[in-house]
Amino acid sequence: MDRRSRAHQWRRARHNYNDLCPPIGRRAATALLWLSCSIALLRALASSNARAQQRAAQRRSFLNAHHRSAAAAAAAQVLPESSESESDHEHEEAEPELARPECLEYDQDDYETETDSETEPESDIQSETEFETEPETEPETAPTTEPETEPEDERGPRGATFNQSLTQRLHALKLQSADASPRRAQPTTQEPESASEGEEPQREPLDEDPRDPEESEERREANRQPRRCKTRRPARRRDQSPESPPRKGPIPIRRH
């Protein structure tokens, strides 16, 4: 019974509700409500978009004006600075040209390479040994056909003239070696020419060294001083393997 009474009550309530607010009216009311809400939202969106566009236009105009003014000011500052920097640069370029020394043109022979500097002391040692051994071996190999009982009066003037000729030749050799480059300057040894076939050649005075120590020291100092104008290029060293032959042979000694 209770269940039937409850179902009957629910039916009455529905009928009463439908009578008070029919379904057609309810549907129309919901449609109007949705329309009004959507219209309000659209109006709000439109107004917000219009305001955003106005603000963006204002910002663009302000930024354009600011950038133009900043660019004009920067250009006005850069122009005098660039003119001043160009004038300073021209002055700086003119000063080194005035202060630059006149470089002398040196010969290529004056520039020593590493290989030349290494071979020079070896050639000096070889020339010294040959210079020391030659005067000792010469009197032994020279012909000794002249008798020992030759009078001293005949030897005197001949020996004096021979010594004078030797000193003159040594002096000329010194001048030639001073004029020549240090690379080509080699110690020279002389073989004294016998005045006659039967006369023994006299030994050269050992005190007179054809290589003057003062001139050699001056050359070394001149070679050690750096040249500011032209730099010397370092010579490339090749791999000195035991299979490869030596680069240069023994330096020949000039004989006069």
UniProtKB/Swiss-Prot annotation:
Pfam families: NESP55
Signal peptide range: 1-46
The entry's keywords: Cleavage on pair of basic residues, Cytoplasmic vesicle, Glycoprotein, Proteoglycan, Secreted, Signal, Synapse
Coiled coil: none
Subcellular location(s) of the protein: Cytoplasmic vesicle, Secretory vesicle, Synaptic vesicle; Secreted
Regions of compositional bias (Acidic residues) in chain numbering: 104-139, 206-216
Family of the protein in this entry: Belongs to the NESP55 family.
The protein's name in its UniProt record: Neuroendocrine secretory protein 55
Gene it is expressed from: Gnas
